[in-house]
């Protein structure tokens, strides 16, 4: 069960088609596994369609959407429906079946990375897969810009809590952390960065000029 979700504004931007392709992929992967957020987006899609038909020039504040979504969240859960037949996910189409067999490049300590930015031509963000070995620690770092991350496999923990598979995380310049992979398997994440991270450890910070 996912515990960390995109905020209302991000879901609104996704529903409106305003997110970049890499950010939209992160949302789509989360929605595939999160009925709660999927229901919210379905509602936003329906509201958007009505607004386009009846009042295309009327702007609606985020607080109104939050109020509507809160009402939906408070309603009793609907009866479960039969699961749809298995289909190839957006992730499988992009990277194949086995994430562990990708051509990972060892970076620092327990961290391996794979830059897949070239799969999103015309986009300004850096799109990176990161693998943290089971029980391993990532170097302490902060961010020079915004970083959107979704957990694809395993889990990691930092001072903000534990982030499990399909959890959605957004960090910025004010956030500094040192993730640790928890559980028995490697933790693999997909991150979209507007700028490189900034290492903050006593010795690792010397490597910052070489990070691109």
Q: Which residues are covered by each model-predicted region?
A:
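Conserved short histidine dyad/triad with adjacent acidic residue
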Residues: 113-119, 123-143, 172-176, 210
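Glycine- and acidic-residue-biased ligand/ion/polar-headgroup-sensing regions
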Residues: 133-136, 142-158
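Short acidic-glycine-tyrosine-enriched beta hairpin
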Residues: 158-178
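Positively biased amphipathic helices and basic secretion/translocation or surface-docking motifs
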Residues: 1-9, 22-23, 32-35, 46-100
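Short beta-strand His + acidic residue motifs that chelate non-heme Fe in jelly-roll/DSBH
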Residues: 41, 138-141, 159, 177-183
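Ligand-binding loop in jelly-roll beta-barrel domains
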Residues: 175-199
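Short Cys/His-rich Zn2+-coordinating modules
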Residues: 12-22
């Amino acid at each position: 069960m996912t515990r960390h979700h995109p905020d209302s504004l991000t879901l609104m931007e996704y529903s409106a088609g305003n997110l970049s392709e890499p950010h939209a992929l992160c949302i789509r992967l989360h929605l595939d596994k999160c009925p709660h957020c999927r229901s919210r987006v379905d509602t936003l899609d329906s509201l958007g369609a009505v607004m386009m038909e009846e009042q295309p020039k009327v702007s609606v504040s985020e607080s109104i959407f939050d109020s509507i979504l809160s009402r939906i969240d408070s309603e009793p859960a609907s009866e479960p429906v039969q699961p749809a037949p298995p289909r190839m996910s957006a992730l499988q189409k992009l990277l194949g079946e086995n994430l562990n067999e990708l051509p990972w490049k060892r970076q620092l300590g327990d961290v391996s990375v794979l830059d897949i930015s070239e799969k999103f031509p015309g986009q300004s963000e850096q799109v990176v897969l990161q693998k943290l070995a089971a029980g391993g620690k990532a170097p302490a770092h902060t961010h020079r810009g915004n970083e959107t991350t979704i957990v694809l496999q395993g889990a990691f923990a930092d001072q903000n809590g534990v982030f499990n598979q399909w959890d959605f995380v957004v960090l910025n310049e004010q956030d500094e952390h040192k993730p640790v992979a928890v559980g028995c398997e490697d933790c693999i994440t997909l991150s979209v960065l507007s700028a490189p991270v900034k290492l903050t450890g006593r010795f690792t910070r010397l490597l910052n000029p070489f990070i691109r």
